[in-house]
Amino acid sequence: MQIRVTATAAIAKKVHKNTGFQRFINNSLDRHFSGDWGDISEEDAAANTSDPLYALSAYTAPDGVKIWIKQDYDVVTVLFPSEY
């Protein structure tokens, strides 16, 4: 299976303006793919672990900006929580 990673326009805009944010996104994707679901409840983490192809993870950047990573089988989307 080939995973396709996408980002919303707002995420792409912030990445384009801020290389530090780009590094944060890359690190967050690495964490997501390794099963580190970030800042979510234990219940949600257990659901992700039981079915990682349909997972939602959440991470907070050093500047306080929060992102979500939503996986639906072979499509992974990086977005801001307000975009869900």
Positions of predicted regions on the chain:
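Short, compact, well-ordered microdomains
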Residues: 51-84
